[in-house]
């Protein structure tokens, strides 16, 4: 087997789209059945990756003309203790199995971090598929998340808010601006640019809904992204700027009690939701969420 030094390393271009998509499909085991379930066709999902190659830095390793390993760095901003920093979000990390174990990914990471430093990015982030691997490469866990399961009888019933909830389109401006406002006041939150929003929705089913809570002055103060399937409400994301919006969203969830048996969702480690329940005997699971490392302390 060749060593990492014997391969070619370069940034991918749009001409590499077919190989880029093939490596992603193989590594993350995206089947035709899964594409159909989410409403995608193979050519559509491939074409949807064009913006990634155009607006993100995708570094690849080639054995001859064949792409064998890659990862993408999305240019984002992050709120860290009320200061906004430029960060590189590493994603789409993948290598064909026959090329693992010989230092390719380590070399790609070094080159990627070096480029981030040149571009003035302060931090690098990723969602790990292997915590020990990234520990070995110098990354550390920086956040956790709580996954929760709530029975329909445990949904808060004694909550009410003076405002109202409306379902809106995925590209609704108030919805996007509300997330930006939330990010501006929340430590550890990423600001989403157009590319990040595209990735946010990539694998969501068409029946996924966005519900926004408005106060009595018609100001959006919270939202939830959710899907109802097989009598379960799956909450992808729920944020709120104040307690009123939080209560309003839970009131909205309770309005679905005749349609659902359970609520499944995720929340921040610092915000356990058992305290919000009339019956706090719910299932909550804490797991590591994101890993990060400092790129530049200047």
Report the location of each language-model feature.
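Short amphipathic alpha-helix that is part of the acyltransferase structural core
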Residues: 2-75, 82, 89, 155-195, ...
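A short, internal acetyl-CoA/4′-phosphopantetheine-binding micro-motif in the GNAT/acyltransferase core
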Residues: 90-100, 232-243
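Conserved acetyl-CoA pyrophosphate-binding loop and the N-cap/start of the following alpha-helix
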Residues: 99-111, 244-248
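Conserved GNAT acetyl-CoA-binding A-motif
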Residues: 109, 114-128, 258-268
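Conserved active-site alpha-helix within GNAT-family acetyltransferase domains
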Residues: 118-122, 128-146, 248, 270-286
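Amide-forming acyltransferase catalytic core, primarily the GNAT-like/NAT-type
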Residues: 144-236, 243-247, 251-256, 284-298
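C-terminal amphipathic alpha-helical segment
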Residues: 258-298
């Amino acid at each position: 087997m060749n060593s990492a030094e014997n391969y070619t390393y370069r940034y991918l271009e749009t001409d590499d789209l077919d190989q880029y998509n093939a490596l992603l499909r193989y590594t993350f085991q995206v089947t035709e059945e899964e594409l159909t379930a989410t409403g995608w066709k193979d050519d559509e999902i491939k074409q949807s990756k064009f913006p990634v190659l155009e607006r993100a830095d995708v570094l690849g390793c080639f054995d001859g003309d064949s792409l064998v390993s890659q990862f993408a760095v999305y240019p984002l901003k992050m709120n860290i203790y009320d200061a906004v920093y430029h960060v590189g979000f590493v994603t789409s990390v993948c290598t064909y199995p026959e090329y693992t174990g010989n230092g390719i990914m380590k070399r790609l990471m070094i080159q990627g971090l070096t480029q981030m430093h040149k571009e003035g990015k302060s931090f690098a982030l990723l969602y790990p598929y292997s915590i020990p691997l990234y520990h070995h490469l110098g990354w550390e866990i920086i956040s956790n998340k709580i996954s929760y399961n709530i029975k329909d009888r445990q949904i808060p019933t004694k909550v009410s808010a003076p405002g109202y909830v409306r379902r809106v389109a995925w590209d609704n401006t108030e919805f996007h601006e509300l997330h930006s406002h939330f990010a501006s006041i929340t430590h550890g939150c990423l600001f989403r640019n157009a590319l990040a929003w595209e990735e946010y929705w990539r694998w969501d089913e068409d029946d996924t809904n966005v519900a926004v809570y408005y106060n009595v002055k018609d100001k959006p103060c919270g939202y939830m992204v959710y899907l109802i399937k097989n009598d379960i409400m799956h909450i992808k994301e729920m944020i709120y700027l104040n307690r009123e919006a939080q209560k309003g969203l839970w009131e909205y969830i309770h309005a679905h009690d005749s349609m659902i048996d359970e609520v499944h969702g995720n929340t921040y480690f610092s915000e356990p939701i058992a305290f919000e329940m009339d019956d706090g005997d719910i299932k909550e699971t804490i797991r590591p969420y994101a890993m990060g490392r400092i790129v530049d302390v200047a």
